[in-house]
């Protein structure tokens, strides 16, 4: 529980106004450029997905025209609509980066998908404003840092009890990026924060459905809308983040926040550099990635063929097994949160990319048969070690009587230490 905020809302406002690209170290700019390229690539792949097409059809109906590019479509849109559609496309594959936490009390040691909301907002608004590339990059970095530090500060119950922080906190990242490009003053940013706080949304029951990426799309859209409204004189309450009825108190179920994760650390260091982000080798829930790596190691090291496998066991803690909740995946979207599918895909094809995460492959007879061989086990020893890392062990029983065992690597993928191959 926070005992005092020290004017957190005001500090966010000051940071949003004060960051200058010329003052940033080269490492921050380098990581930002990598993030932009990675996320745009993921978004371009995502536009071909059916849910992204459905959303475009609804949002680009007559009367929704505007000057901003919509990826994968010849039509253009207003900034808030373009931001939503492009952010949805960037998250629909579940292939975008993930924020690493600085402290061990955060479940998984992970927080938001930080790049998509501020980037989608900055690109759409920047296009309408005819901003320079440097101005768009500056706005993106403002939004990225605001989003990440708010995510660090709010009590972990925000996520544990059901909110999807990429949707809720991502709204503030998109708002801050937009506010910077619109040139809002301190009073207007305060109103925009309050508007954004009332628009923040996203609940985890929708993981494994078309609605999960809508959380991120709406974060981008709502952030743009909040700043656009404030620019036109629309008002909101004061102390929107740290007031007694503010975002931190309400969205943490009254458990508050840690002001020390914002006070004095906004841009010091920049989260994009330290602790950085985890990049994904597979287009699915990051909680399953270490187990998939372990399965791939077993299959390749021992040259295991699918027909040799009698049974597969995944031993893990509840921080993996509860969120990855689909025991038998019946669609591509469910497969993204299904350990039996994740391990089955690797067992059958020795990889798991966008060509494996399709309804056709998920529903194929070999995959459904392999999933039936997979069981998940809540391991008390792993559970006792805590939740700050994604820990698991994969065991494969072969028909010849051997059992192969591979503990998963606890380290997260990043751009510096792990090649994606």
Where are these regions (language model features)?
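Short connector loops/turns at beta-strand edges and beta->alpha or beta->beta junctions
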Residues: 117-119, 146, 198-202, 265-269, ...
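Residue-level detector of well-ordered alpha-helical segments, enriched
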Residues: 28, 32-35, 117, 135, ...
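Terminal-appendage/accessory-domain detector
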Residues: 1-111, 208-221, 225-419
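Short amphipathic alpha-helical face segments that pack within enzyme cores
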Residues: 116-124, 145, 169, 173-177, ...
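Hydrophobic alpha-helical hairpins/lids featuring a short glycine-rich hinge
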Residues: 91-152
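Glycine-rich, mobile lid/loop segments that gate access to catalytic sites or pores
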Residues: 126-225, 237-244
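Well-ordered alpha-helical scaffold segments within catalytic/enzyme domains
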Residues: 46, 122-129, 175-182, 227-229, ...
């Amino acid at each position: 529980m926070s005992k005092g905020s020290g004017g957190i809302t005001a500090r966010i406002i000051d940071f949003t106004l004060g960051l200058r690209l010329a003052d940033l170290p080269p490492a921050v700019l380098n990581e930002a450029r990598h993030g932009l390229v990675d996320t745009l690539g993921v978004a371009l792949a995502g536009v071909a997905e059916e849910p992204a097409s459905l959303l475009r059809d609804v949002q680009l109906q007559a009367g929704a025209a505007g000057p901003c590019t919509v990826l994968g479509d010849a039509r253009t849109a207003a900034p808030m609509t373009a931001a939503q559609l492009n952010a949805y496309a960037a998250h629909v594959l579940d292939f975008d980066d993930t924020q690493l936490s600085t402290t061990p009390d955060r479940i998984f040691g992970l927080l938001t998908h930080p790049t998509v909301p501020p980037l989608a907002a900055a690109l759409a608004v920047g296009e309408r404003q005819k901003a320079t590339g440097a101005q768009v990059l500056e706005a993106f970095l403002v939004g990225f840092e605001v989003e990440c530090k708010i995510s660090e500060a709010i009590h972990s119950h925000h996520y544990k009890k059901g909110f999807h922080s990429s949707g809720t906190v991502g709204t503030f990242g998109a708002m801050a990026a937009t506010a910077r490009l619109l040139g809002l003053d301190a009073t207007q940013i305060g109103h925009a924060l309050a508007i954004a706080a009332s628009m923040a949304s996203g609940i985890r029951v929708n993981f494994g459905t078309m609605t999960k990426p809508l959380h991120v799309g709406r974060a981008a859209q709502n952030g743009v809308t909040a700043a656009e409204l404030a620019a036109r004189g629309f008002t909101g309450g004061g102390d929107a983040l740290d007031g007694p009825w503010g975002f931190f108190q309400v969205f943490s179920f009254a458990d508050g926040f840690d002001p020390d994760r914002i006070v004095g650390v906004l841009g010091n260091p920049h989260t994009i550099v330290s602790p950085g982000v985890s990049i994904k080798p597979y287009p699915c829930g990051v909680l399953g990635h270490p187990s998939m790596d372990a399965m791939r190691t077993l299959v390749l090291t021992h040259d295991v063929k699918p027909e040799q496998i009698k049974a597969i066991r995944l031993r893990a803690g509840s921080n993996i097994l509860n969120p990855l909740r689909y025991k038998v995946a019946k669609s591509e979207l469910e497969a993204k949160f299904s350990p039996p599918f994740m391990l089955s895909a690797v067992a059958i094809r020795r990889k798991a990319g966008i060509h494996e995460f399709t309804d056709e492959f998920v529903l194929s007879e070999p995959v459904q048969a392999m999933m039936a061989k997979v069981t998940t086990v809540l391991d008390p020893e792993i559970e006792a070690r805590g939740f700050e890392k994604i820990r698991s062990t994969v065991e494969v029983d072969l028909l010849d009587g051997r059992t192969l065992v591979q503990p998963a690597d606890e380290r997260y993928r990043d751009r510096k230490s792990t090649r994606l191959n």
